[in-house]
Swiss-Prot record:
The gene is leu-5. This is Leucine--tRNA ligase, mitochondrial. The lineage of its organism: Eukaryota, Fungi, Dikarya, Ascomycota, Pezizomycotina. Its main location: mitochondrion. Belongs to the class-I aminoacyl-tRNA synthetase family. Coiled coil: none annotated. Keywords: Aminoacyl-tRNA synthetase, ATP-binding, Ligase, Mitochondrion, Nucleotide-binding, Protein biosynthesis, Transit peptide. One of its GO terms (cellular component) is mitochondrion.
Length: 994
């Protein structure tokens, strides 16, 4: 028998375990006859109540008990992916070896939604895996002198054990690790499919090189200060031959389909904005500036892309990127330029240093028109500047200090006293809206410095200027994108090997499908020696191979893939994790993708999500999905449908920890340096001073981390889950405060007490003859007033109305996800209404039991083990299956069998739940004196012919109240002696005229 105390009954009540078995078997399972009733007959009501009272709720025991039962059930039934029809996925973790509270938050959210959908009758896929490749594992292996595979597998085992303690419902038979050859075999297949379509190519390019990690970084992996996102080292610029994926081929659909993701707020607005900005589509013009040169090797003109051709009159200089072909050519004969270029790798990309190119000037193309103001005709200096990006536009900018912030800063750095030219203003009656130290960057109206264009709107003027210069070949309309092809080459060991061999005769040759996977070689001596760099480059036995095409000597590519390649498609592998022939089957992709709900941090808003969208679009227009495009162009044009990997995206907020600092030094204090004997006044142990308290991002340096496994071991997984949801809306930062969990544990204890009371209810109670809640209220409406029990009906209505309100509210919150915190608060409110003595004691037993049944099912996604125990105590006949088995098909109202194990839905009783109480405002001689709650008059008294009886009823009801008697039967006021008693609005207003 399941017990809410999670301890065997025979051990708790000596010599009773065996004797209870015949009692239980002789009392058939029935909603009318919970097991507590049978036991009361055998033990006696009082002894049974004392038995429960002597044993407190043991959440830790419940966790262990139900995790074991779930595991046994999973082994018996298996987990059939073919039956799944919903897909909930949290972003899979890097196996660092330790779960942190951020992990706990995202995985709690995912499991709660998956369990909610399961209770609604869906077959939910909730997989878990490991983003196992990458630099952290390789660096850890070097530091410890062990193989990264050994390190990674040990960490996976630790984290899997930790995840097991949080009462999750993961589909472990779908588990994957990206470092497993069975997984990266298919990553290599996808790469080769991209290569076949011309979407994977090798090119020499200037790259960002991390001298500490000794690998190439994508632009996105370099921070604003020019440092590596991993090591923090200053990034160097080097020219290397690298592998790229042609994401630019899909840029139009990547941009256009953001509109689909914006519908119904499926994706957060800020994520969509970040994606759009990263794609960076801009329309403008390519403008050609003729060059006046006084030496050889100089260009005849410099082309510049600008999105603001309206500011052409304001150009005061030209700036070139260090990689611009003209700069590279001029550097061959200019030692000073060479020296300047050598300093750039150590500079911030935002640096305003510059090198003025000697003997070369540019001419504004508008200078050739007579109407152009003289200032615009002056030749322009040309600089080499690090703030100009070599891979955007033409690698050149036209410097407009009056209307661009960066240009203004650069101009002031090199021409501090020189005037800034403003060529447009906010409105026609202003000469300028900018001060010398503040450029005007908005669109507006052209001013006198714009010659004949004065007074025109800047947008109109920009279009006219391009058309003016176009016949002479000096300007043309142009479209530019910020997005660059995805550089995936990494000069490191711990990643997916690129399945390419290089043959002296055949060139670049793909590894045949039957030779996949290309596995990483064992290099134990490299790790044992704690060596850095890419060990693949020295593994001659692995490098040297034969060409698949001609059979001659060839060498393997020694680069590995960016780990974002693995995470760009892992969600597809989960749906068909054991497929040995293909990454996934087209049939399963049709059923389970796109992912219904994807949950993770906003820090992945650009890279991971953008790459996943690109790869999914490719996969769904390829042979992998049962389609075959003849070329990359065909793949793009075939995308008349919207192919997006994640229907809905939820980004949860970070978890901040309580942080203590010394008020004198600002130093972060360790836990043992803070005296918390009075939690409200924490003190610095060393000085006795009050410590400063704040909530900040958790980190080792701030000594504010919390081990979630320790927390769960103390309070239990269910209480921890409820606490982490209750403390903040999903999208907001969660300030972790352990002390506040007491509110959650008190709530669980109250629910526990309710279940005990119902299971141990007295046999003297006469159960309702109605079989369902709806039937009960219909019977009550049909009963004659003479036999009705108003107190019972009022309490039953109060409880069931709150149940129906909570069902609607909680269902909406579960569906919305971002308001999961209100699920807890709503369920707490419902618990209070049910447990209120005035309601519980008076309500019909059927209503009490069904209300608690609904409460348990609504809280089950949040506190699954606790809910399972409560459910099986209330309805022991369901002990053969889990609350989450999903075997039922009913609505879940009015029975305790498996059909009731569904998430509750509104039962149509709203019209039957009209309150038997109403507020009556009482006036004395037309002035309102007080208001009281009175009984609602019977329908017959509302007839016009029953006015006198209605007056008598209302006066009688008012006098039943303490306030009514005090104010209408004393202090000189006697309603029985009133001149007139007026009843208005069916008794909602009573006017006593004395």
């Amino acid at each position: 028998m399941p017990l809410i105390c999670a301890r065997p009954l025979g051990r708790l009540v000596p010599k009773l375990g065996a004797s209870l078995r015949p009692v239980l078997s002789s009392h058939a399972a029935s909603p009318r006859r919970p097991v507590g009733v049978a036991l009361e007959q055998h033990l006696g009501t009082e002894s049974w109540k004392r038995f429960y009272a002597d044993h407190k709720l043991d959440l830790l025991a419940l966790d262990q008990k139900w995790r074991q039962k779930w595991a046994e059930s999973s082994r018996e039934k298996g987990n059939k992916e073919d039956e799944k029809n919903k897909y909930v996925l949290p972003m899979f973790p890097y196996p660092s070896g330790h779960l942190h509270l951020g992990h706990l938050r995202v995985y709690t959210i995912a499991d709660v939604i998956a369990r909610f959908q399961t209770l609604q009758g869906h077959k939910v896929l909730l997989p878990m895996g490991w983003d196992a490749f990458g630099l952290p594992a390789e660096n850890a292996a070097i530091e410890r002198g062990i193989n990264p595979a050994t390190w990674t597998k040990a960490n996976i085992a630790k984290m899997k054990e930790q995840l097991g303690h949080m009462n999750g419902s993961w589909d472990w038979n779908c588990e994957l690790a990206t470092c497993d050859p069975d997984f990266y075999k298919h990553t290599q297949k996808i790469f080769l499919a991209l290569h076949e379509k011309g979407l994977a190519y090798q090119a020499e390019a200037e790259v960002n090189y991390d001298p500490v990690d000794k690998t190439v970084l994508a632009n996105e992996q370099v921070d604003a200060n020019g440092c590596s996102w991993r090591s923090g080292a200053r990034v160097e610029k080097r020219k290397l031959k690298q592998w790229f994926l042609k994401i630019s081929e899909f840029r139009e659909s990547l941009l256009k389909d953001l509109e689909t993701l914006a519908k119904n707020e499926a994706w957060p607005e800020r994520v969509l904005a970040m994606q759009k900005n990263w794609l960076g589509k801009s329309k403008g013009a390519t403008v050609k500036f003729p060059v006046l040169a006084f030496g050889q090797g100089t260009p005849s003109a410099i082309e510049v892309f600008t999105s603001r051709p309206d500011t052409l009159f304001g150009v005061q200089y030209i700036a070139l990127a260090a990689t611009h072909p003209s700069v590279q050519q001029l550097a061959k004969s200019d030692p000073e330029l060479q020296a300047f270029l050598s300093t750039l790798p150590g500079l911030s990309p935002d640096s305003k240093v510059g090198y003025l190119l000697p003997h070369i000037r540019a001419v504004n193309p508008l200078a050739y028109h007579e109407e152009t103001p003289e200032d615009t005709k002056v030749s322009l200096p040309i600089y080499v500047a690090p703030y100009v990006l070599g891979d955007y536009g033409e690698g050149a900018v036209m410097g407009v200090p009056g209307h661009d912030l960066r240009d203004h800063a650069f101009w002031k750095e090199h021409h501090y006293d020189a005037p800034v030219r403003f060529v447009l203003a906010a409105s026609e009656d202003e000469s300028t809206t900018a001060m010398p130290n503040e450029p005007f960057t908005e669109h507006g109206v052209m001013n006198a410095n714009s010659g004949i264009f004065k007074g025109k709107s800047s947008k109109e003027a920009g279009e006219m200027l391009v058309k003016l210069l176009e016949p002479a070949g000096l300007a043309k309309e142009t479209e530019k994108w910020r997005l660059r092809d995805w550089l995936i080459s990494r000069q490191r060991y711990w990643g997916t090997p690129i399945p390419i061999v290089h043959c002296g005769s055949c060139g670049t040759v793909p590894v045949p499908d039957e030779q996949l996977p290309v596995e990483l070689p064992e290099v134990d001596e490299h790790w044992a020696g704690k060596k850095t760099g890419n060990p693949l480059e020295s593994q001659t036995d692995w490098i040297n191979t034969s060409c698949p095409k001609c059979g001659g000597e060839a060498k393997r590519d020694t680069d590995t893939m960016d780990t974002f390649v693995d995470s760009s498609w892992y969600y597809m592998r989960f749906i068909d994790a054991h497929n040995k022939e293909a990454p996934f089957s087209p049939e399963k992709a049709k059923v389970l993708t796109p992912v219904d709900l994807y949950i993770g941090g906003v820090e992945h808003a650009i890279l991971h999500l953008l790459y996943s969208r690109f790869i999914y679009k490719f996969l769904m227009t390829s042979s992998f999905a049962g389609k075959e495009a003849e070329s990359a162009e065909a793949a793009e044009s075939a995308s008349s449908e919207v192919y997006e990997p994640f229907k809905r995206l939820i980004t949860q907020g970070m978890v901040h920890g309580k942080t203590y600092t010394d008020p004198a030094t600002g130093r972060f204090l360790k836990p043992d340096e803070v005296d918390l004997s009075d939690p409200h006044q924490p003190k610095v142990v060393a000085t006795g001073a009050l410590a400063n308290v704040s909530y900040e991002k958790m980190s080792k340096s701030k000594h504010n981390g919390v081990d979630p496994t320790t927390f769960i071991a103390q309070y239990g997984a269910d209480a921890t889950r409820a606490h982490i949801l209750f403390q903040a809306p999903v999208s907001e930062i969660l300030d972790w405060d352990e002390s506040k969990i007491t509110g959650v544990t008190r709530w669980l204890s109250r629910v526990h007490d309710l279940v005990q009371k119902i299971a141990c209810s007295s046999t003297s109670e006469t159960p309702s003859s109605a079989s369902t809640v709806k039937a009960f209220f219909e019977q009550q409406q049909q009963q004659p007033e003479s036999v009705a029990d108003p107190a019972k009906l009022d309490a039953s209505i109060t409880i069931w109305r709150e149940v129906q309100r909570t069902i609607s509210s909680v269902t909406a919150s579960y569906n919305k996800v971002y308001t999961l915190n209100t699920v807890i608060s709503d369920l707490m409110s419902l618990t209070n209404v049910i447990a209120s003595p005035s309601n519980y004691d008076a309500a019909d037993p059927l209503i009490r039991r069904e209300a608690v049944s609904a409460l348990i099912r609504m809280m089950a996604p949040v506190a699954p083990a606790f809910a399972e125990e409560c459910w099986h105590v209330l309805f022991p006949e369901s002990s053969s299956s889990s609350l989450f088995s999903g075997s039922g098909s009913g609505s879940g109202s009015g029975s305790g069998d498996e059909q009731a194990a569904r998430f509750p839905v509104p039962d149509g009783t709203e019209g039957l739940l009209k309150s038997r109480k109403q507020t009556c405002a009482v006036q004395l001689n037309g002035k309102t004196k007080f208001a009281v709650e009175i009984g609602t008059p019977p329908a017959g008294l509302l007839e016009k012919s029953a006015e006198e009886k209605l007056r008598e009823f209302i006066v009688g009801e008012v006098l039943k109240t303490e306030e009514g008697r005090a104010k209408l039967e004393g202090r000189g006021v006697d309603v029985s002696k009133a001149k007139k008693v007026i009843v208005v609005r069916g008794g909602k207003l009573l006017n006593v005229v004395m």
